[in-house]
Amino acid sequence: MRLPVAARVYVGAVIVLGAAIVAGLLPSLQFPHPSLFAGLLALSVISSALKVDLPVGVGSSCISLSYAVDFTALLLLGPAPTVLIATASAWSQCSFRMKQRNPAYKTIFSMACLAVTVAATARVYTVLGGTYGQLASLQALMGAAMAYFLVNSAAVAAAFALANRRPVFEVWHDNFLWSITSYVVGAVAAGIVVEVWQRIGQWEASLALLPLCLTYRTYCIYLKRIADEQRRVAEWTQLHRESTEVLAR
């Protein structure tokens, strides 16, 4: 499907902005904890493939556990390494377990969206007093989580809205607002990981992923029920249409 001009301009602008952010962060890229970076990178790529399709009415979208991993990386490593981790997770999410192959521009757009999201989240986190490598105040943690949710969901919703010529806020409100709980849970889990990492060690910190696994499983069940309900409604609608046509003859 050929995108409307407004959608193409928007997608192109986000890609350019994302590329500029990555290029701007590369000079400050450091790996003081290479094993931690490698572990979070692998975990983010793997968890991004464990995605749940969202029943949006304007296209296809999904959520995954990679958000919490990326958020944890931001708290522990800072924005530069996290941008690499987040863009890799976006690539994985758009490349694996797909019902149909994504066009290249969608994959690049998703990667750019996460680069922009990480940069904005990092800015909010530091403005609220957060520091990397140690757990900050609840205000900084929740503020950063809300920034991540708002920037990421709004960026994706805008793309869907422009592609389908619908109001951006309507698309965001109807299809993305409800997922805010997953971001709150992810931020709390990331905070627990950082705290346990500092006090005990990295292997014990992995226990904080249990709430995320439960959240993921809950979403799977919930969205499966929505999909089943939508299928039943479609079947009844089709049956009603066929019955009406028969009676009209």
State each model region's role:
Residues M1-D174, W178-W203, L209-R217:
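Short helix-perturbing small/polar motifs within transmembrane alpha-helices
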Residues S206-R249:
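Acidic/His-rich, divalent-metal-binding segments that scaffold phosphate/diphosphate chemistry
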